[in-house]
Amino acid sequence: MNIAFFTRPKQEITYLYTDYTVRQALEKMHNSSYTAVPVVDREGHYVATITEGDLLWFIVKGEGGEPHTMAIENLEQFKLTDVGLNKFKNQPISISSSIEDLIIRSMETNFVPIVDDRGIFIGIVTRRSIIKHYYEKNILPHE
């Protein structure tokens, strides 16, 4: 079994582009009900995972870094790159990585971004899909 078995392709999930505005990101996340989503550049490379908290703290810090100084209308002026994406928070793994690497990484986060050998984002593996698979394979048959 390999990582591709668990991977949900990017066509089936919500992700954002680095040039989206903060408003666009909030709308897309709200419509999908996800609290964290992958961010990719226009060439398709995985850049980071952004959370509702990242966006909230960007708004709260305001334009000058002072609390409560950002007007809602200004959310259209700022791109996701202005938010300060944390590229180390949810690093991707390669589609050719081992299942062991996938499981270890999934213990730290709700989903693991998957990239090809060129760093192109191809999808995610959710912690839920891993747990469900192992439950159905190892626990359910014994009940």
Predicted regions, residues:
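The conserved cystathionine-beta-synthase
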Residues: 15-33, 39-41, 59, 91-109, ...
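Bateman (tandem CBS) regulatory domains
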Residues: 1-13, 75-89
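Short, mixed-charge, low-aromatic patches
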Residues: 12-15, 53-63, 87-91
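Helix-adjacent hinge/juxtasegments
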Residues: 51, 56-81
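Short beta->alpha transition motifs characteristic of CBS
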Residues: 34, 46-63, 108, 121-139
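Short N-terminal micro-motifs specific to bacterial/archaeal maturation
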Residues: 13-16, 46, 74, 90-93, ...
